[in-house]
From Swiss-Prot:
Keyword vocabulary terms for this entry: Cytoplasm, DNA-binding, Repeat, Transcription, Transcription regulation
Residue stretches making up the SpoVT-AbrB domain: 5-47, 76-119
UniProt record similarity statement: Belongs to the MraZ family.
UniProt GO cellular component terms: cytoplasm; nucleoid
Protein name in UniProt: Transcriptional regulator MraZ
Localization: Cytoplasm, Nucleoid
Gene that encodes it: mraZ
One record GO biological process: negative regulation of DNA-templated transcription initiation
UniProt keyword Transcription regulation, yes or no: yes
Amino acid sequence: MFLGEYQHSLDEKGRITIPAKFREEIGYKFVATKGLDNCIFLYPQDEWQLIEKKLRSLPFTRADVRSFVRFFFSGAAELDLDRQGRSVLPLNLREYAGIDRDVIIIGVGTRVEIWSTEKWTDYNENAQSSYEEIAENLVDLGI
């Protein structure tokens, strides 16, 4: 399970260092894609395969399904870790997430998210005031 928050910076080659605590679980080959809220999602291969299977099972005749599947898969790339735990983030994903140099890498259970530091700060400032409301709504889902 991916947990925690880490600050990192991209190097001049667009590489990011994956936190040591995440490396074993993410594996040496993993998938990066456009995430929700303008971040980048990273998935271990086995988790990606589960999501891929679920998305393929959705009815492609629905416009919302087609739109989401296009969004999710068109931005996806299979990435490799080098021996130092680094991986090149594709330019299209960096541009999508507004990442220039400084990033926040967070563990979110079954995936890792990479945020520009600025967007993560803004997200947290805006979300803090609504955490209680969100928690109340989650009760309706049985959590």
